[in-house]
Amino acid sequence: MKGVVIFGIHHWGFSVRVPRTSAGGSSYIVPPITTILGALSRGYCSDYAVKNNVSCTKEFIDKFSSDLFWVTYGTEEHMLMPYSDLLREERVPYRQSKNRSLDHVSDWFGVSAFGKVYCENVNFSILLLLNKENSEFWSKLGWQIISLGTKESLVTITDVKVVDVEESSDEDIYTIYYIPAECLTNTEEFEVVNMPVKSVYELSSKPSIGVFSNFLVPRKTPFIGGKVKVKKSNVRGDICKVYKMADKYVITFKEGLEKWYSK
């Protein structure tokens, strides 16, 4: 198996809004699989127009998701800090016409919280484990990533490497990448986060939130990220495997993304 390692730097941090929260919302503490797939689709979708109210990202995932065995993200430094910006913003457009007069000026504004993760100049890497020998295609898409999250969540890609992927039997595993929660029996030094693995890309008046799964994110309170030691005996070998890509370890389901994305 081949893999692609995408190295980059966060400019200030990122914001990936959590659905089903209030208007203020909060941000995921790491970019989930769906965000990474969306970022990779940018190169493919650069000249694409929305067709039949369906996002280009859906076409990209339908066409190429079978190429990917697994996708994950991690940072070498444990320096990611979640926070919320409180802003007093104008709410006039959302008010009934009877409440837009000067007599109701005190109701024109409201406080909103915008969830973000601050990680200025923090180095990150994205791992792509490939089912097919098309590393050149995925390397090109990796170089074209400009943000992870909102369009303001800018990143600079510094390097993209193609490496060999092999199963690991090492007793001590050091990883910076998030892991499916079912894969470990002991979750110390991790935080359990419910994140999207499959999104809904059709524009519709009916709400839909996609498919979610629990992941273990390395965390040394109060900061997120960094390297965590995992014993081989802590990995559930009946449902998960450990892979090594150069000097990087990743733990995932035996079926990889096929758990949610059928070939």
From Swiss-Prot:
InterPro entries: CRISPR-assoc_prot_Cas5_N (IPR013422), CRISPR-assoc_prot_Cas5a-typ (IPR010153), CRISPR_Cas5_sf (IPR053725). Belongs to the CRISPR-associated protein Cas5 family. Subtype I-A/Apern subfamily. Part of the aCascade ribonucleoprotein complex, minimally composed of Csa2 and Cas5a, which binds crRNA. Other possible components of aCascade in strain P1 are Cas6b (SSO1437) and Csa5 (SSO1443), while SSO1399, Cas5b (SSO1400) and SSO1401 have sometimes been seen weakly associated. Csa2 is probably the major RNA-binding subunit. The Csa2-Cas5a-crRNA complex also binds target DNA homologous to crRNA, probably forming an R-loop. Purified aCascade forms a filament about 6 nm in width. CRISPR (clustered regularly interspaced short palindromic repeat) is an adaptive immune system that provides protection against mobile genetic elements (viruses, transposable elements and conjugative plasmids). CRISPR clusters contain spacers, sequences complementary to antecedent mobile elements, and target invading nucleic acids. CRISPR clusters are transcribed and processed into CRISPR RNA (crRNA). It comes from Saccharolobus solfataricus (strain ATCC 35092 / DSM 1617 / JCM 11322 / P2) (Sulfolobus solfataricus). GO terms for biological process: defense response to virus. Keywords: Antiviral defense. This is CRISPR-associated protein Cas5 2. The aCascade complex was purified from strain P1. CDD domains: Cas5_I-A. Coiled coil: none annotated. It comes from the Archaea. The keyword Coiled coil does not apply.
